[in-house]
Amino acid sequence: MLANVGAVPSLPTATLAELFAADPSRAERYVIEVADLRIVLSRQPIDDDIVAGLVQRATDALVAPRRDAMFAGERINVTEDRAVLHTALRLPRDAELVVEGTDLVPEVHEVLDAMGAFADRIRADERITDIVNIGIGGSDLGPAMAAQALDAFRHPRLRGHFVSNIDGADVATTLAGLDPASTLFIVASKTFGTIETLTNARTARAWLVDALGEDAVADHFVAVSTNAERVSGFGIDTANMFGFWDWV
C-alpha cells in the first residue's frame, strides 16, 4: 500500500527567520486548535508545499477512514481479530459508543468510578505511604509515565514505585526501603498469568505475609486484571480488582 503513497516535498532550505519574513501571517496560519489543544507549527521547518504534501500522503494512506474505523470499534487489530478502542476509555460519561450491540461507555465509567472511589479511600487512609506497581510492558511503562508526568500533583504522603524486571534485585531493592504495614501493591496483568509480573508479585506477597500474616494480602494487594479466578486464588479481594477489555 505504501508504494502508492505520494512523496512528501523536501524541507525548505530557508531559515525560520526567512520563512517568517516571507510570510508575516505564518504565526497565525500555522496553528491547529482541537478541543482544548492548541498546536503551534509555525516554528517548524515547513511551508505550504510540505503541509499539502503531508495531507496528501495521509489521504493516500487512508488515514481518515482507518481512524474512523478504529473509533467505530471495527476489528482493525487483524492479528488478534479485535477492536482497538483505548479511545473509549477517554469518552465522557454522556457519550455513546455501541460496538456489536453493546454501549461500552457505561461499562468504562463503572470501572473508572470504582477506581476513583478506591483512590479516594487510599488518600484518606493515613496508614498507606507507599504504592508499588508490579507489571511489565504497558502495565509498567504507562503507569510509570503517568506518575512521572503528574508527580507535582500527587498526594504528599504517597510515594510511587515500579517493579518490572524479573531480576530479583529489582523487587528486592524496592522492598528494602519499605514498611509492609504501610505498603500497597498493585498487580497489573490482564490474564494474571504473566510470568515476570507473577514472579515479582509472589516475592512481594511472601515479604508481606512474613511480616503481617496471610490475612494482610487482601488489605495490601489490588489487581488490574480480567481473570477474577486467578486474582482470588492469589488472595486478592475481587472487589479490589479493576477490569478492562480485550480492546484496550
Model-derived features with residue positions:
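Basic/polar N-terminal segments that are highly enriched at the extreme N-terminus
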Residues: 1-7
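Preference for short coil/turn "hinge" residues that link or interrupt alpha-helices
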Residues: 4, 12-13, 39, 134, ...
